[in-house]
Amino acid sequence: SRTTYNGQFTGKHTLGDADKLDWSTGYSYANRNMPDRRRYTTVLNEETNQLEVENLNEINREFSRLDEHILSANINYQHDFSFGIFTPSLKAGAYTEYRAREYNTRFFIYSWKNGLPSAYKVMNVPNELLQEKNYGENGLYLLEQVDWRNNYEGNNLLSAGYVGTNLPLGKLNVYAGVRFEHNRMELVSHTQKNEESPTSVFYTYNDFFPSVNVAYRLNDKQQFRLSYGRTVNRPEFREVSSSVYYDFDLASNVRSEERRVGK
């Protein structure tokens, strides 16, 4: 099941003839609860041409829950100048966002004392093998595969500010600006498999992002535009954690490797 919520308050203000101010604050919540994902794998026995359960470890159940809270706020200010027919404007603003996430998972496999009997290997897994009559002291039972490294908590604080100017020069319009971002991520994960061992790792980034946009108006319907900008792709919580997750596109379990910031 999934739950999402997004709420926002905004305001716009005109301060005299030359100044404008707008702001917003917001809160978002996201939840993904997977109470019982069941997955099994069978192989084809070429001699009997039957699908068989080769390993009970390939029949498993997973329970996971993810909660994320996001708080944000931003403010933008614009001042318009007037020097005859030349009317440039100055823009400045700030933005901040705080994210907190918690992810927990439990993983179970099936087992059978002294191994799964041959007669049961060819049974249809959901409709025959996993029936209540096959559970017991001398039959099927669930075995939890404890791995604390798959659980993590994290928080991320992003603070940004920018300044820019717009220069209307007849048919030519130039906008130039720069934005600064400070990003600090804390990931709390576990270093030991079989016991709680929370360890914090911090990732801090400071980046400048210049941008220039030049537009030349050819006529009322056409214009020629050149632009330059710089962006960044920072890793997400899951990408820097040691958590293992199942990728349905790859049909395999995936553990995140060390990720670097892409620019």
Question: What is the predicted role of each segment?
Answer:
Residues R2-Q8, G26, R65-N74, D80-K263:
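Structural signature of Gram-negative outer-membrane beta-barrels, strongest in the C-terminal barrel
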Residues S1-S89:
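Outer-membrane beta-barrel domain signature, strongest for Gram-negative TonB-dependent receptors
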